[in-house]
């Protein structure tokens, strides 16, 4: 088996990948993550996932490189990481009683052959009706400013959910393991 490389510095993605009990290393790619004009959210996450994997191919010429990228979509609007309390409060209040779809782009690049599998896995969160006091309590408790959508699904953020739907709950945290396993199996990786 070629060595696995996770093209990410995300602790969340690292924790998810470790569930597969396969050895891997991590490296952070340096790419331009800006949204192109007329690019759909699905096209954006697929492109960025593949770019992250390809950015490390030259320095890791015989690896299976995993790239992933995620955006949250509320209505027609892409919402990213809030970075601040104020932005997070605004995002959560806008999502109150609504549905937020998380689109996770996934790429698996065999840097030896150049073959790259790319996909997008959606996951939808139906939010509870939230008031400002509840949102502010949550934000002070968890400070999810580095998370698209302004909550941590693996933590207290689940208290904001009414329900969820999608093919793979791990995609909500940023690395869709079910689809990744399909890709790894196609590359001949044995799991377990």
Swiss-Prot record:
GO terms for cellular component: cytoplasm. GO terms for molecular function: nucleoside triphosphate diphosphatase activity. It is an enzyme of class 3 (hydrolase). The record marks 12, 70, 154 as: Important for substrate specificity. SUPFAM superfamilies: ITPase-like (SSF52972). The active site is at residue 69. Its cofactor is a divalent metal cation. Its EC number is 3.6.1.-. Its main location: cytoplasm. Transmembrane segments: none annotated. HAMAP family: Maf (MF_00528). This is 7-methyl-GTP pyrophosphatase. It comes from Pseudomonas fluorescens (strain Pf0-1). The lineage of its organism: Bacteria, Pseudomonadati, Pseudomonadota, Gammaproteobacteria, Pseudomonadales.
